[in-house]
Amino acid sequence: MSESDSNHLTGRDWLWLGLICSFGLGSVATQMAWVLALLGGYLFWRKGAAVIDPSLRQMWFWLGCLAIPAFCSIFDSTLMDRSVRTLLRMMSFGLVAVVLIQMPPSVTALKKITIGVALAIGFFCLDGIFQKVIGHNIIGNALWSDQFNPTRITGFLGLNYAWVLMVLSPWLFEGCRLVDKRGFAYWVAIPLLFVAVILGGSRASGLLLVISVLSYATLIGVRLGVRASVQFVVPVFASLLGSVVVLSANPELGDRWLAMMGVFPGGAGDAAEILSWRPYLWDAAIALFLEHPINGVGIRAFGVSSESLLANYGVADRIPGAAYNWSPHLSVLEVAADLGAIGLLGYAMLLTTLVRWLINAPMLAIAPGLTALMALFPLGSTLPLFSARVSAVAWISIAAALAFAKVATHSQRQ
C-alpha cells in the first residue's frame, strides 16, 4: 500500500468512527451492538482460537465482574424475566468485543478517528446551543418542556443531551490534544463544552464534567508531564470562571444550578421540590440492600421492589414514570440494591482494574477508556447503570479501548 493510501480511512475505519459517534444517538448504538453481537457469535464459532487473545480475555474478565453477580441475583429477583434479559444483553457485549478486538481500525486511523469524534462532539455542542438560542436545533427539533425544565435542550442527542456530552468529553479533550500540541484547541472546545452543559441545566452532568476534567488532567500529567496537564487545566479554569459569570448574570440558569443543593438536608428550600424524591430513592436502595445483602433484589428489579417502601414514604406519586422503570439515581446504590455485596465487590474490582489498566495503556486508548469510566462512574445519577444505553456506551467503549491499545502496542513493537 502506498503512503498516500495509508493516510486515508478505510471502510472499516469509517465504520469505527460511525460506531463511536452513535454513542450519542442512544437506540442506534444499542441496535448496532446487537448486530455486532450476532457477527461476534459467528466469528467465535468459526475462529474459536480468538479466545486466546489477551485483549479479549481482559474484556471477559471485566464483564464477569458484573455478569457473575447479575447471574447470582436472578435467583431472588422480583422481576426474573427482566433480570434474565438484562444479563443476556450484558453478556452479548462479550461477543461484540470479539468483532471489535479482532477487527480493529488501522494504526494510521487511530488519531483521525479520535479527532473525528471530537469534531462530532463539538458539533453536538453547537447544535444544542443553537437550539437554546433560537428555539430549535439545526434539523428543526424544538426545545423539550417537562416538569423539570420548561426549555430543555435535546439537539441530536435527545433528553440526556448533557449526560452524553460529559460521557464523551474525553474524546473532545484528546482530539484537541492531538490536533494542536500547543493547546490552542482547548481554548475553543472547552468553553464550548461548558456553555453547552450550563444551558443543558443538568446538575448531575456538571459533576461528571468535573470528574472527566480531573481524570483526564491527572492521566496526561502522569503520562506526558506537568506541562501537558497545565495546557489543559488553564482553559478549564478560565471556562469555569466564565461559567460563574454567566450563572450570576442569568437568574433562571443560576437558580436551576443552585437547586442541586436541595438533595441535601437544609438545602435550597422550595427550589428542592424537583429533587425532593431522590433521597427517598437512596433510602429505599439502602433498605433493600440491608434486606438482601448477599445477591440483591435482582438486576433491574429495584423499581418494583421499592414501590411499597416509597409508597410508605409518601413520595411514590411524585416520582416520574412507572415503578417498573425507577432506579436509585446513584450508580453505586443501584449496584448495591440490585446485586448485593457480591455486586459491590465485582463493581469495585471492575473500576480499580480498569483504572490501573488505563494508567499503563497507550495514549490512544485513553479516550475510550475514560468514556467507559464516565459511564460507569459510581455517583452517576442521570440514567440507570444497567440500562441499555449506559451498557452500550460503557462496554463498547471498553472494547474500543482494548482494540485501540492492541493496535497501538503492535505498531510500537514493529
Give, region by region, the residue ranges found by the protein language model.
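Alpha-helical transmembrane segments of multi-pass inner-membrane proteins
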Residues: 20, 95, 111-142, 148, ...
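Juxtamembrane membrane-water interface segments that cap and precede transmembrane helices
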Residues: 13-18, 141-156, 276, 318-333
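A membrane-periplasm/extracellular boundary helix in multi-pass inner-membrane enzymes
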Residues: 126, 130, 199, 220-269, ...
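Membrane-embedded alpha-helical segments of multi-pass membrane proteins
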Residues: 27-46, 87-97, 160-169, 207-214, ...
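Transmembrane signal-anchor hairpin modules in multi-pass inner-membrane enzymes, especially those
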Residues: 1-85, 95-115, 119, 176-184, ...
